[in-house]
Design a protein with these regions (language model features):
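Short sequence/structural segments immediately N-terminal
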Residues: 2-171
Length: 171
């Protein structure tokens, strides 16, 4: 019994299947090797050493390493939101893509400044970790970063300028 022409067109030949399988294997393997060489897997955890995969972060890592925060806080403890996992991973992914874009286009600034969204996250995390201190002593816990932008208070780093990264001149 001869094959029906419609069946021949719907199901590719064995040679085509093998070729497609090899090409897909090479693409997936190359992509996996590329991601491994970029150390992409290090960004899935909270290890601060991942932040120095990019050379521009080395001075910030070094100053954090010599600060009191290095004993108790990772980069993600301060720089990533902790309200829920979705918000954390979305922020981490978007921020990471901005960093990759700046790195690939060589447009990263000499001295990194937190953008408004990052500053909001950082201040929220200062308040989250230092809740008793901020509520009992300085009333900072009752304001947020957006209020500081309109003059209704100060951001934590307005007074604590060298926390946790210290003076860059001290390196």
């Amino acid at each position: 019994m001869a094959k029906l022409p419609i069946i021949s067109k719907l199901f590719p030949s064995c040679r085509w299947k093998v070729t497609a399988l090899i090409v897909c294997g090479v693409l997936v393997g190359s992509g996996g090797l590329f991601m491994y060489l970029l150390r992409a897997h290090t960004y899935l955890g909270d290890d601060p050493a991942a932040c120095v995969n990019c050379h521009i972060m080395a001075p910030y890592y070094a100053t954090w390493m010599h600060s009191s925060h290095s004993r108790d806080a990772t980069c993600n403890d301060c720089h990533v939101p902790h309200e829920n996992m979705v918000k954390k991973w979305m922020f981490k992914g978007m921020d990471g893509m901005k960093h990759v874009g700046a790195f690939l286009t060589k447009s990263e600034p000499q001295a990194i400044q937190a953008e408004e969204a990052s500053a909001q996250v950082i201040m929220n995390n200062c308040i989250r970790c230092h809740t008793q201190l901020t509520n009992d002593f300085v009333d900072v816990g009752r304001i947020d970063y957006m209020m500081t932008l309109i003059g209704d208070g100060k951001a934590c780093w307005d007074c604590h300028r060298d926390v946790p990264h210290g003076g860059m001149n001290s390196l």
